[in-house]
Swiss-Prot record:
The modification Phosphoserine is found at S336. Its EC number is 2.1.1.221. Expressed in embryonic and fetal brain. It is expressed throughout the dorsal telencephalon at 8 and 11 weeks of gestation, with highest expression in ventricular zone and marginal zone. Detected in cerebellar cortex and nuclei, but not in dorsal telencephalon, at later stages. This is tRNA methyltransferase 10 homolog A. Residues 61-74 have a biased composition (Basic residues). S-adenosyl-L-methionine-dependent guanine N(1)-methyltransferase that catalyzes the formation of N(1)-methylguanine at position 9 (m1G9) in tRNAs. Probably not able to catalyze formation of N(1)-methyladenine at position 9 (m1A9) in tRNAs.
Length: 339
């Protein structure tokens, strides 16, 4: 090997050695199985893959939302017609007639609920607001005793509530805003059955998600304040598998539906969720009569079976008694809100 080639050979060898050292350092820096890093399970790997796909499709989802907004805008424009002057174009709307009936959600039970239930109440209020905005006969909507956890949750998760229209959101108690003689508290514990709605009155719905921890509380409050109270005529038209306590938004929507149809049974069956197992009272009576006949036919057995037959009849009379005491009357379903 000549003396001229020797420096080049030495320089090349040094470069190779440096590259080898760097590769060794990189390998040593990688986490090894069993050395401070646990192996990734298949489930974790799937989650990571899904997360990566979600991030990669972010722009695609954004584009789809943009296209959806454009499509809805075009649909709205197609529903427009020129006015008598021929200048502006107005949306073709149904004939909306505002009701004079005042419907109040009483939020004075804030201190009795945990945060999870506060969030459920917030969603139910959102649903009430959305349904009232699209109703044919919207009511005069009031939210009273607004504050505490509920207001904080709305401030954090739904800042747009300050721009809601056609709603009176007040920190005061409803008794400070409306005359006592105009108030009717809607509570399932009241012995009074509501036959029809008086649109000159103000009906109060208890804003309480209690999971049956505070039975009779709204009825007690109405009695303590000395205001009228009543319950919806649910038992006159509907037989349910569960207790007659309904979620705030269900009561609200039933009243909106009744104002449109003036038919309690239609209002109940339009609004009540299927999980309630609601059937018309006449069909429920026919079913009960058929069951009783079946029991009587079986009573022709020996006397030793009489105790079992009596137990069977008791079960038929109240098959859902335990379920009624345990069922939670709330529902978290939320629509996007118009502002």
């Amino acid at each position: 090997m000549s003396s001229e080639m020797l420096p080049a050979f030495i320089e090349t060898s040094n470069v190779d050695k440096k590259q080898g050292i760097n590769e060794d350092q990189e390998e040593s820096q990688k986490p090894r199985l069993g050395e401070g890093c646990e192996p990734i399970s298949k489930r974790q790997m799937k989650k990571l893959i899904k997360q990566k796909q979600w991030e990669e499709q972010r722009e695609l989802r954004k584009q789809k939302r943009k296209e959806k907004r454009k499509r809805k805008k075009l649909e709205r424009q197609c529903q427009m017609e020129p006015n008598s002057d021929g200048h502006d174009r107005k949306r073709v709307r149904r004939d909306v007639v505002h009701s004079t009936l005042r419907l109040i959600i009483d939020c004075s039970f804030d201190h009795l609920m945990v945060l999870k239930d506060i969030k459920k109440l917030h969603k139910q209020i959102q649903r009430c607001y959305a349904e009232n905005r699209r109703a044919l006969h919207p009511v005069q909507f009031y939210l009273t005793s607004h504050g505490g956890q509920l207001k904080k949750n709305m401030d954090e998760n739904d800042k747009g509530w300050v721009n809601w229209k056609d709603i009176h959101i007040k920190p005061e108690h409803y008794s400070e805003l409306i005359k006592k003689e105009d108030l009717i508290y809607l509570t399932s514990d009241s012995p009074n059955i509501l036959k029809e709605l008086d649109e000159s009155k103000a009906y109060v719905i208890g804003g309480l998600v209690d999971h049956n921890h505070h039975k009779g509380l709204t009825y007690k409050q109405a009695s303590d304040y000395g205001i009228n109270h009543a319950q919806l005529p649910l038992g006159n038209f509907v037989k349910m598998n569960s207790r007659k306590v309904l979620a705030v938004n269900h009561v609200f929507e039933i009243i909106l539906e009744y104002l449109e149809t003036r038919d309690w049974q239609e209002a109940f069956f339009t609004i009540l969720p299927q999980r309630k197992g609601a059937v018309p009272t006449d069909k429920a009576c026919e079913s009960a009569s058929h069951d009783n006949q079946s029991v009587r036919m079986e009573e022709g057995g020996s006397d030793s079976d009489s105790s079992e037959e009596e137990y069977s009849r008791n079960e038929l009379d109240s098959p859902h008694e335990e379920k009624q005491d345990k069922e939670n009357h709330t529902e978290s379903t939320v629509n996007s809100l118009p502002h």
